[in-house]
Amino acid sequence: MDVNPTLLFLKVPAQNAISTTFPYTGDPPYSHGTGTGYTMDTVNRTHQYSEKGKWTTNTETGAPQLNPIDGPLPEDNEPSGYAQTDCVLEAMAFLEKSHPGIFENSCLETMEIVQQTRVDKLTQGRQTYDWTLNRNQPAATALANTIEVFRSNGLTANESGRLIDFLKDVMESMDKGEMEITTHFQRKRRVRDNMTKKMVTQRTIGKKKQRLNKRSYLIRALTLNTMTKDAERGKLKRRAIATPGMQIRGFVYFVETLARSICEKLEQSGLPVGGNEKKAKLANVVRKMMTNSQDTELSFTITGDNTKWNENQNPRMFLAMITYITRKQPEWFRNVLSIAPIMFSNKMARLGKGYMFESKSMKLRTQIPAEMLASIDLKYFNESTRKKIEKIRPLLIDGTASLSPGMMMGMFNMLSTVLGVSILNLGQKRYTKTTYWWDGLQSSDDFALIVNAPNHEGIQAGVDRFYRTCKLVGINMSKKKSYINRTGTFEFTS
């Protein structure tokens, strides 16, 4: 029998009818299986956005690395990661000019925090890549394992010390010729159960000592494990998120502390505040734009979305920002803060568990671990997977993919917000030196942009200039997903 779809809704209140197409009701989708495919997508896409960069080889790990910095200037509207160092530094300088003393004050605050933070700060957080076991563990366990291994290798780490001392150990560990770790392994054997007389699989867990040479250790220290982001609504495709190991975490924490301190002083930053305070900030920006605009002026707001924000950001750019922000600070402080972006420039993405294969005819299932993707015959894969593997092969080392460009999800939210705000800051009339000007709010990859101008041409010119300025620092405003309204009606980080 044919069902007329409109009949289905006749007896249904409008509210309920809407909810059938609305992604926020019911159970959120969870992902099952391995995230290997999604991670390969991320790695391949990130390289594609930076493909015109320069290839080099990391002398320590042998990993091929792509550096898009100061790459070709954009000629089209395709998303790209070719940030120009001088443009980023210029934007930082203007940000400081608009907020005298902001960087120095934030550095002083951060310096104090750096000297007081204890190691146990790193036990906060969920799943963390545990480099000693090469898999995810709760943060506290991963930290304990790292400290235990450090100690047995002659470093001075302890669980109650300062974080900065632990980070000194991390630095020393990277200079060591080899690191000895204790790994766990499973033995399976088939035995007959005495009671039921059936065959059962018995598992025993053993421990064995393993030596990692410098190269293997560095690869693990620079590895971000990947998982599939769960419970994302309104999306057809899942995506991969990263969980860094303990060597990287402490350094990232200090960088984000500094960036958070800067964001707190910026009226255009939607972080670190949330909820009502964020709405209040937005209201203030709108009020400022309305108050300062002449009656004859037009005001439009863009609810913006950036294309693949973190895949087009670049750690080398963050290094340049940090170098500039901390330029008047003591050497030790500058060094501690520059390590996170340097590690990210040399990061490796772990491809997860690999692929499941099953043979219908023989009722067999087997897992192909990520380590085998470099050598396995591609005839076993379908076409799309085959293309992915072919693309990623030159980047593979020990089941991890070299991923120099891009940031991975959720890593430097605060610092990337500072970069976004620095472009919003350039919209002041004294900088644009024309009839249009802009302001807005930035919260990680989300932004609201308000443009004022005497006429529609001016608005268009202002939006264009904002778009192009963003391009120069590796931010790609999505022309498909951003929409423009009269100021007063728009959405920001729903």
UniProtKB/Swiss-Prot annotation:
Q: Where are the transmembrane segments?
A: none
Quaternary data:
Influenza RNA polymerase is composed of three subunits: PB1, PB2 and PA. Interacts (via N-terminus) with PA (via C-terminus). Interacts (via C-terminus) with PB2 (via N-terminus); this interaction is essential for transcription initiation.
Q: What is this protein called?
A: RNA-directed RNA polymerase catalytic subunit
Relate the protein's function as given in its record. Answer: RNA-dependent RNA polymerase which is responsible for replication and transcription of virus RNA segments. The transcription of viral mRNAs occurs by a unique mechanism called cap-snatching. 5' methylated caps of cellular mRNAs are cleaved after 10-13 nucleotides by PA. In turn, these short capped RNAs are used as primers by PB1 for transcription of viral mRNAs. During virus replication, PB1 initiates RNA synthesis and copy vRNA into complementary RNA (cRNA) which in turn serves as a template for the production of more vRNAs.
Which catalytic reaction applies to this protein?
RNA(n) + a ribonucleoside 5'-triphosphate = RNA(n+1) + diphosphate
Q: What is its EC number?
A: 2.7.7.48
The protein's matches in InterPro entries, at most eight in alphabetical order, are given as: RNA-dir_pol_NSvirus, RNA_pol_PB1_influenza
Q: Name one GO cellular component term.
A: host cell nucleus
UniProt lists compositionally biased (Polar residues) regions at 55-64
Motif mapping: Nuclear localization signal? 187-195, 203-216
The record's Gene Ontology biological-process terms are: symbiont-mediated suppression of host gene expression; symbiont-mediated suppression of host mRNA transcription via inhibition of RNA polymerase II activity; viral RNA genome replication; viral transcription
Region called Promoter-binding site, residue ranges: 249-256
**Localisation per UniProt entry:** Host nucleus; Host cytoplasm
- Record domain RdRp catalytic: where: 286-483
Modified how: Phosphorylated by host PRKCA.
Q: Which GO terms describe its molecular function?
A: nucleotide binding; RNA binding; RNA-directed RNA polymerase activity
UniProt cross-references to PROSITE patterns, sorted A to Z: RDRP_SSRNA_NEG_SEG (PS50525)
Region feature Disordered, mapped onto this chain: 50-82
What UniProt keywords apply to this chain's record, in alphabetical order?
Answer: Eukaryotic host gene expression shutoff by virus, Eukaryotic host transcription shutoff by virus, Host cytoplasm, Host gene expression shutoff by virus, Host nucleus, Host-virus interaction, Inhibition of host RNA polymerase II by virus, Nucleotide-binding, Nucleotidyltransferase, Phosphoprotein, RNA-directed RNA polymerase, Transferase, Viral RNA replication, Viral transcription
